């Protein structure tokens, strides 16, 4: 179904309000856990913050706004991330980090 410009603007307004509500609810829930809960959930907190910024400030396609309206989209993206990306990304990232550290150490030794 195609939407006219006014309908898309209305959908975007509802979408942004929905994302803001979802993010605010998550933040309140996490902060109720205290400092230990914040530490335990730090990766999820960072993920939510970055996805929130992306959804609020980048231009999505009109189809995305329509499809995501009414969905707890940040939560659903977190679920996808934890199942498909997190296990692979953490290991790959740490391997790259160790490799970069070693390369930097070699360069510093050569320069000394």
Where are these regions (language model features)?
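Acidic interaction surfaces
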Residues: 2-112
């Amino acid at each position: 179904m195609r939407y006219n410009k006014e309908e898309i603007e209305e959908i975007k307004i509802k979408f942004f309000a929905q994302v803001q509500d979802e993010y605010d609810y998550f933040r309140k829930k996490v902060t109720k856990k205290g400092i230990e809960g914040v530490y335990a959930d730090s990766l999820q907190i960072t993920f939510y913050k970055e996805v929130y910024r992306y959804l609020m400030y980048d231009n999505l396609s009109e189809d995305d706004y329509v499809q995501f309206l009414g969905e707890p989209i940040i939560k659903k993206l977190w679920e996808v991330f934890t199942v498909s990306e997190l296990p692979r990304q953490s290991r790959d990232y740490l391997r790259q980090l160790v490799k970069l550290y070693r390369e930097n150490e070699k360069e510093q030794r050569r320069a000394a």
